Amino acid sequence: MSIIKKIGSEDQNWVLTDEQKEEYNSILNISGNGIMGYIEIPSIKVSLPIYHGIDEAVLQIAVGHIEGSSLPVGGENSHCVISGHRGLPSAKLFTNLDQLKEGDIFMMRVLDETLTYEVDQIRIVEPEDLSNIGIVEGEDLCTLVTCTPYGVNSHRLLVRGHRIENIDASSIRVTADALQIDPVIVAPVVAAPILLLLLIVLLVRYRKR
């Protein structure tokens, strides 16, 4: 049995052995940087890389695939789980995940495939509650997870989608940029060169006098 079948099969195993972790980290890692694919959520303007695992270093800049859940390749009897932070000062990530509604869509782009999911269930659960992220027989599911309420983080927000046919998304661009910088941070960076230029102009005029 291949590692794709062993990890995230009908017998979901949330705790992997060292051997399984090593194999897991090598799957869908074509470029060798740990990126499995990309997720896009058009309604909240999210476009982020999906990394292996949910180490803090990953969640500071992107979203992570929860090891032990189904791999982000789709298929019957699969349930992929993607986790992301919210409320970071330098990256929006899943900050606006609570704005999603049933009927919204999100896409995962893995290798040369696009997997499209339609939101059909939104729940708030205790952190230890795994009952909503298990495999449902015959279904192709993906759940997006983040902490809630905003700033308190005592519970988990689960936004689940079921696989649908791909839609025409030719006008939507997917990027590898994990960071959406806050305007408060960007403004001083943009303003500094302008202020410096104005200062130089004023100094030149002053000297001419």
Predicted regions and their residues:
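Solvent-exposed, non-transmembrane regions of membrane-associated and secreted proteins
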Residues: 1-184
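C-terminal single-pass membrane-anchor helix
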Residues: 173-209
